[in-house]
């Protein structure tokens, strides 16, 4: 029996809010109507800007939504559903070290972006860590470094505590006890996030 031909990956069709089909090839976005007729083509950055502004009328709308969002990953996923891969776009623009938040504000509203490192350093200058035990402070410090290197969604997921970086503190269940339990650990993460984005006025 001959080998089966490789199965081509099934692409998830992207449909915009007007029900039009969207294809993205080489940074050019093509939008088709229900009959497959090409309606328009635009650059991926213009397409991204239009979609962000369609979703959030103003910069303060977006900041409010970002701060209110329980998990920043849901915002990232809403962009993916529109066919916008923030990570790839940032890499393409030479802005991989910039927070998704800053990148979105920059693309849509022309706001000067901060790098994740700048945001992390602003948190380090504050007295936020001092209310925690030395071990809990060390955990938060590693989480802040994770944010700086990889982004906020990495920090939000409690699975991060299973990584080798945290091995010296024990298993995740033991680590959350350093904060007084899971609820207080999650509250500490929320507070860390609030400090990361503190300079933003909504």
Predicted regions and their residues:
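Catalytic cores and motor modules of nucleic-acid processing enzymes
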Residues: 2-202
């Amino acid at each position: 029996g001959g080998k089966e031909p490789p199965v081509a990956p099934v692409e998830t069709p992207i449909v915009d809010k007007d029900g039009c089909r969207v294809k993205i090839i080489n940074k050019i976005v093509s939008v088709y109507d229900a009959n497959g007729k090409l309606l328009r083509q635009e650059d991926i950055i213009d397409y991204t800007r239009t979609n962000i502004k369609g979703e959030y009328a103003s910069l303060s709308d977006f900041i409010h939504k970002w701060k209110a969002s329980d998990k920043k990953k849901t915002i990232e996923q809403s962009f993916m559903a529109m066919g916008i891969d923030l990570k790839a776009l940032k890499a393409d623009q030479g802005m991989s070290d910039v927070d998704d938040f800053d990148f979105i504000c920059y693309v849509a509203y022309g706001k000067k972006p901060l790098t994740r490192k700048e945001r992390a350093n602003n948190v380090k200058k504050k007295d936020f860590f001092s209310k925690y035990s030395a071990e809990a402070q060390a955990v938060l410090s590693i989480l802040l470094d994770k944010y700086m290197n990889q982004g906020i969604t990495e920090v939000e997921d409690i699975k991060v505590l299973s990584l080798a970086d945290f091995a010296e503190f024990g298993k995740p269940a033991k680590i959350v006890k350093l904060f007084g339990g899971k609820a207080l650990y999650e509250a500490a993460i929320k507070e860390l996030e609030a400090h990361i984005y503190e300079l933003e006025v909504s």
